[in-house]
UniProtKB/Swiss-Prot annotation:
Higher taxonomy: Eukaryota, Metazoa, Chordata, Craniata, Vertebrata
Any GO CC annotation of this UniProt entry: plasma membrane
Disulfide bonds: 190-202, 266-316, 268-284, 325-334, 364-378, 406-413, 440-455
Annotated source species: Mus musculus (Mouse)
Name under which the protein is recorded: Interleukin-17 receptor C
Domain SEFIR: 496-645
Residue intervals annotated with topology Extracellular: 22-464
Length: 698
């Protein structure tokens, strides 16, 4: 059909193939018959009244087949109308009846059989809003009257119709001896026919081509400049429904770009001129496009509206099947329950359900096309909770009073009982016993197809795994005794104290020396917190809040606060004690931690909680302010062993080689101290010192 060629040309992005039509110059209707027949067309139309069926008195002439052909009726060369030519094929039906009246001579019978046959053939034509009926008288000579044989055809010119209209044609005789013939045809529009210069309504019709431009689809509207027309982009989910997406009046020519992800099979286009009574071009060029079908499945959604009720949302009809399936807890593919449960055709945008199905969390629905699952949703997942480890038994009717039972597994439906090595086969007798004693839940039943039963597997799982649980208990007991044997080591590990190292910001070289001390202490083992390792938290919360939080936490855990005194720290402490204004540098947090710890010293709460240290050669012990001397004061690295004992609270160091470890710490501190003092606090002091990985105390 021309319409098919039109859509094919759109898909290829080329000009469509068009059909040239025969032209009729006569404005009146005419009729003609094939050789041997005579025809006469009644003037004007007749009433379209088929009447009731009657019995044929003998051989009668009846229509047997209808054909149509499109032509142009052209009173003027450029003023034509689309017209439907109808060809009616005729045949003789029935036989001569034997005479019932006595006394008829053979000559009279022969005379009646040598007479010609006549018939009145009615052609009924409907194409909204047009409805017409034409009457043809057809005569067949006696020599052509052969019952059961075709005698020829009659041609009627013609019924006028609109471009793109759907026409219906009926044919019958008066009186009517058989059921009327009928024919329905969709006429092409201006695009599919060579009529642009012949039919005035097609003169200003926009032409449209579809092509691909990368990830986009380009709609090219070939319209003369300054020509106004309307463009409508819409969805047609069902034949009689239309959902408009975009409508606009445009001036040609135009290029309209669509994203390829927006294409779906029911996306259609209408274009028409703004001239009065202009024809509309309507087509859906993406119906057979594979990409449009893929997009449709990506857009489609399967929603559970309520327990057991779902809805498939999609902009177009989906060519799929909806199947009830069983989802096992192991996340294996959902197994369709067809048979015995019949599947449904996919219906979009309407609530659906499987009737007579009882609720179970493992029952789901899936939408499939050509054995491929596209969408799936579990109907009772929200109302009945997670999947259950139940075994689904399928009871099938095998005879009038006979049934068979099989267990649905990933490998298929295992007959019960069975010698297979599957889980259901091993428990076959027990499952059958549960089934016969009505311990299983019936999910679905059909007197002709069968039933579905869900059998709980909890008791079989408990019995099977009892030895495993005993083994786990024995393993747990063994692990418990092993941990008891390691009790001393764990206590030693828990006995390692936490320490907060507080210092002043005396320059980059001094900060590297502080970092070396913190790294060395963290290997003793001690859990060390220092602001150098927590710059991000310090910046986020503020120095005062960070120091206060760390001090309170460490003291609650029984830890110790280490005060590292330097000349700058001593000077600021003196200013604090003399109630002088302290203006710290941009990176100096000394004022913050002084406000946290000084009340403990002034109120006598420092003993056992604080330790003071300073580096050899950098400070004289008498320089430390007197309020801070109530806490032990050590010089590093010369008094390192005593300092470590004070940090451990009198406990011995951890197992291993403590003397070697103390010696390594001493050497590390002395090397860092020598490096910083030799550089005279020059920028870049101690850059070669690797602080190593450090543990921040949260």
């Amino acid at each position: 059909m021309p319409v098919s060629w039109f859509l094919l040309s759109l898909a290829l992005g080329r000009n469509p193939v068009v059909v040239s039509l025969e032209r009729l110059m006569e404005p009146q209707d005419t009729a003609r018959c094939s050789l041997g027949l005579s025809c006469h067309l009644w003037d004007g139309d007749v009433l379209c009244l088929p009447g009731s069926l009657q019995s044929a008195p003998g051989p009668v002439l009846v229509p047997t087949r209808l054909q149509t052909e499109l032509v142009l009726r052209c009173p003027q060369k450029t003023d034509c109308a689309l017209c439907v030519r109808v060809v009616v094929h005729l045949a003789v039906h029935g036989h001569w009846a034997e005479p019932e009246e006595a006394g008829k001579s053979d000559s009279e019978l022969q005379e009646s059989r040598n007479a010609s046959l006549q018939a009145q053939v009615v052609l009924s034509f409907q194409a909204y809003p047009i409805a017409r009926c034409a009457l043809l008288e057809v005569q067949v000579p006696a020599d052509l009257v052969q019952p059961g044989q075709s005698v020829g055809s009659a041609v009627f010119d013609c019924f006028e119709a609109s471009l793109g209209a759907e026409v219906q044609i009926w044919s019958y005789t008066k009186p009517r001896y058989q059921k009327e013939l009928n024919l329905t045809q969709q006429l092409p529009d201006c695009r599919g026919l060579e009529v642009r210069d012949s039919i005035q309504s097609c003169w200003v019709l926009p032409w449209l081509n579809v092509s691909t431009d990368g990830d986009n689809v380009l709609l090219t509207l070939d319209v003369s400049e300054e020509q106004d027309f309307s463009f409508l982009l819409y969805l047609r989910p069902v034949p009689d429904a239309l959902k408009s997406l975009w409508y606009k009046n445009l001036t040609g020519p135009q290029n309209i770009t669509l994203n390829h992800t927006d294409l779906v099979p029911c996306l259609c286009i209408q274009v028409w001129s703004l001239e009065p009574d202009s024809e509309r071009v309507e087509f859906c060029p993406f119906r057979e496009d594979p990409g449009a079908h893929r997009n449709l499945w990506h857009i489609a959604r399967l929603r559970v509206l309520s327990p057991g009720v779902w809805q498939l949302d999609a902009p177009c009809c989906l060519p799929g099947k909806v199947t009830l399936c069983w989802q096992a807890p192991d996340q294996s593919p959902c197994q369709p329950l067809v048979p015995p449960v019949p599947q449904k055709n996919a219906t979009v945008n309407e609530p659906q359900d499987f009737q007579l199905v009882a609720g179970h969390p493992n029952l789901c629905v899936q939408v499939s096309t050509w054995e491929k699952v596209q969408l799936q949703a579990c109907l009772w997942a929200d109302s009945l909770g997670p999947f259950k480890d139940d075994m689904l038994l399928v009871e099938m009717k095998t005879g009038l009073n006979n049934t068979s039972v099989c267990a649905l597994e990933p490998s298929g439906c295992t007959p019960l009982p069975s010698m297979a090595s599957t889980r259901a086969a091993r428990l076959g007798e027990e499952l059958l016993q549960d089934f016969r004693s009505h311990q299983c839940m019936q999910l679905w039943n059909d007197d002709n197809m069968g039933s579905l039963w869900a059998c709980p597997m909890d008791k079989y799982i408990h019995r099977r795994w009892v030895l495993v649980w005993l083994a786990c208990l024995l393993l747990a007991a063994a692990l418990f005794f092993f941990l008891l044997l390691k009790k001393d080591r764990r206590k030693a590990a828990r006995g390692s104290r936490t320490a907060l190292l507080l210092h002043s910001a005396d320059g980059a070289g001094y900060e590297r020396l502080v970092g070396a001390l913190a790294s060395a202490l963290s290997q003793m083992p001690l859990r060390v917190a220092v602001d150098l390792w927590s710059r991000r938290e310090l910046s986020a919360h503020g120095a005062l809040a960070w120091f206060h939080h760390q001090r309170r936490r460490i003291l609650q855990e029984g830890g110790v606060v280490i005060l590292l005194f330097s000349p700058a720290a001593v000077a600021q402490c003196q200013q604090w004690l003399q109630l002088q204004t302290v203006e710290p540098g941009p990176h100096d947090a000394l004022a913050a931690w002084l406000s946290c710890v000084l009340p403990d010293f002034l109120q006598g709460r420092a003993t056992g909680r604080y330790v003071g240290v300073y580096f050899d050669g950098l400070l004289h012990p008498d320089s430390v302010p007197s309020p801070f001397r109530v806490a032990p004061l050590f010089s590093l690295p010369s008094q390192l062993p005593a300092f470590l004992d004070a940090l451990q609270g009198g406990c011995s160091t951890s197992a291993g080689r403590p003397a070697d470890r103390v010696e390594r710490v001493t050497q590390a501190l002395r090397s860092a101290l020598d490096s910083c003092t030799s550089s005279s606090e020059a920028p870049g002091c101690c850059e070669e010192w690797d602080l190593g990985p450090c543990t921040t105390l949260e």
